[in-house]
Amino acid sequence: RYTDNEIADRWFSDMYAAETCINRYFNGRLMPQFPFEAMTSAALNVGCTDLWWNKKERHFTQIYREAQAQHWPAMCHRLPDFRYSAGKPVLLPRRLREEAWCLQH
């Protein structure tokens, strides 16, 4: 069992890693606030590498490409691409909420 301080430390560390990922790989420093927050949420849930690299097809993801081009609305619309866990689209409600949040910019 974790203490409250251990939970807080892990949360801080995980959030910092997700924000660093978005800044490093997705032009996060140039991104409007709402897209940055939505992408950070996705990175926290999906993992940094899986958000920018398609391991199965061995190429950059479309969401990564849109971020590189600073096409923020197009990037936001790619969030639902990451809806699967264990082969089932159980993450779709979360991704749709992130997409809606992202598009508020």
Task: Identify the role of each PLM range.
Residues 1-4:
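Acidic/histidine-rich, surface-exposed loop or edge segments in extracytoplasmic proteins
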Residues 17-57:
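Active-site nucleophile-His-acid catalytic modules used for acyl/amide transfer and hydrolysis
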Residues 6-13, 19, 48-105:
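Long, amphipathic alpha-helical surface segments
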